[in-house]
Design a protein with these regions (language model features):
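Membrane-integral, polyisoprenol-dependent glycosyltransferases
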Residues: 1-326, 461
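Membrane-embedded architecture of ER/inner-membrane glycosylation machinery
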Residues: 2-4, 149-176, 186-206, 222, ...
């Protein structure tokens, strides 16, 4: 069905591209507002409570604690912890590579990896403290086990290990979906009806159910909230159902994988009962059906949706017509070339003050260091730009070239953004600046009670300032109040005297 093409592409170069995508932005900045900070606060809670999380799936936080401990001599806690996301993304790439090779042939493996890294939605989510990257890796392992289980017990063991990771990461519903797919595979595919497949399926289901029973028994003995620990609270959280949220999100989140996936399904529509088409399609449809009933959906939960689309996209890439391939190629070249030029213009305004009108606009946006030259930033930016240009002059014509150029361009843009603007972004999106101002006003041994300060902000301010912040009145000598734009300042006792006010840029 699929051509097992042999394309001469240096493996080391592709590995370097993966590393270039993964490393920039993973370290070198404080926890940012949003998911990055939220997950870091949960890690602080785990470290404070001795490795126990009361209402969160633990796998990611255990791993983050381990990477933070291993890198403590040379990295801050938050940077070391963020490496856990890099580990889970790398594990995901390994199993996507192996799954695509098993389904479509050797060169389809790198096509699937490049398509996954080229998806716009993974770029930010894959570089922050993000517990859902653990589910991402578990799902990739489960999918590989599901594909290989027809060959015997080794595939069944991979499936079971992936299921264990998924359960520890809070993906009980996704694990159940994979079990249903495994159970129905003999009814749909002839390859799953042999003796080796029966042994593999027996190992997969038996080991998965045994681990699930042991995990449930442990959680029950600990008195943990089962819905939260298993990730089932997503379907019961307060919020409105948005059935169309994830299909609409995939239009940009999974670009450019989804058009290639759609082409593969159309091209192989007469072969729809083969595992290479049917398994990813059934997984995608099953996930979308489940996620349609998630209360308060969000991007983080959509990472798993990228896996079947990347696999199908790899299948479609090698049959893509020349006009469509050239369109993707030139669109990537023009888009990333324009964005790269735009970044350099903004760097010139930020560091050199030229053009003056743009520099004045950046100042009005709250950037306090406009006009201050940072020599290392343009040096790193020039290196990234020259590497990208050098890559474009050497990339060879092949079926992989459109997606290779796209992913390399996206990697260049991300690396350039981190090189030129990681410092300003850190000041704007983290609480370091506010915490430093707070620490300068309050003695190190002081107690600060807070009013209307959200728990995540309070703990991040305490982490960065080294001060003791509490949520209630414990007789502290200092009071910290949060007010928001367009809201009146809350009434406080006249006994309190304002000493300082500050805000993020």
């Amino acid at each position: 069905m699929f051509n097992k093409l042999r394309i001469s592409l240096p493996q080391a170069g592709l590995l370097l591209l993966c590393a270039a995508w993964l490393l920039p932005g993973l370290v070198g900045h404080a926890p940012w507002k949003g998911g990055d900070g939220d997950h870091f606060v949960l890690l602080l809670q785990l470290l404070r409570d001795g490795g126990v999380l009361q209402a969160e799936p633990p796998l990611y936080y255990w791993t983050a604690a381990a990477t933070a401990w291993l890198t403590a001599p040379f990295l801050p806690l938050h940077d070391g912890a963020r490496l856990a996301s890099g580990l889970f993304i790398a594990l995901t790439l390994v199993f996507v590579l192996r799954t695509a090779r098993a389904l479509y042939g050797s060169e389809a493996g790198w096509a699937a990896v490049l398509l996954l890294l080229g998806c716009l939605g993974l770029l930010v989510r894959g570089h922050e403290l993000n517990a859902h990257t653990a589910q991402f890796a578990g799902a990739a392992m489960l999918l590989h086990g599901l594909v290989r289980v027809a060959q015997g017990t080794r595939g069944g063991m991979v499936f079971a290990v992936g299921a264990a990771l998924m359960l520890l990461a809070g993906g009980a519903a996704e694990t159940l979906l994979f079990l249903l797919l495994a159970g129905s595979a003999p009814l749909c595919f002839e390859a799953y009806r042999g003796a080796a497949a029966r042994r593999g399926l027996a190992v997969a289901t038996g080991a998965t159910l045994a681990f699930a029973a042991a995990w449930l028994a442990f959680l029950s003995a600990q008195g943990a909230p089962l819905a939260a620990m298993l990730g089932l609270d997503r379907w019961f959280a307060p919020g409105n159902l948005e059935p169309a949220y994830y299909p609409a999100m995939l239009a940009w989140f999974a670009w450019p994988a989804w058009p290639l996936a759609a082409w593969a399904v159309y091209r192989e529509r007469r072969q729809w009962r083969t595992p290479g088409i049917a398994l990813p399609v059934l997984l995608l449809l099953g996930l979308l059906a489940m996620y349609a009933f998630v209360a308060a959906p969000g991007e983080e939960h959509g990472l798993v949706l990228l896996l079947p689309l990347a696999l199908l996209g790899a299948a479609g890439l090698f049959t893509l017509r020349r006009g469509a391939a050239n369109a993707l190629l030139w669109f990537g070249l023009m888009l990333f070339g324009f964005v790269g030029l735009l970044f350099w213009v903004y760097w010139s305004a930020h560091d050199l003050g030229m053009p003056a009108r743009l520099a004045a606009r950046l100042t009005r946006l709250g950037m306090t260091d406009v006009g201050t030259l940072r020599p290392w930033a343009p040096a790193l930016g020039v290196i990234a730009t020259l590497l990208w240009i050098g890559f474009l002059t050497r990339v060879q014509r092949s079926p992989l070239r459109p997606v290779l150029v796209w992913t390399a361009g996206l990697t260049f843009i991300w690396a350039l953004l981190m090189a030129l603007f990681q410092g300003p972004l850190d000041r704007r999106h983290s609480y370091v600046g506010v915490a430093e101002q707070l620490a300068a006003q309050v003695p190190a041994d002081a107690c600060i009670q807070t009013y209307a300060v959200r728990a995540t902000q309070r703990q991040l301010l305490a982490y960065h300032s080294g001060r003791f912040l509490v949520p209630a009145d414990l007789g502290c000598d200092w009071l910290l109040i949060e007010t928001r734009q367009r809201e009146a300042e809350p009434h406080v006792s006249p006994n309190w005297v304002k000493q300082w006010e500050g805000a993020r840029p």
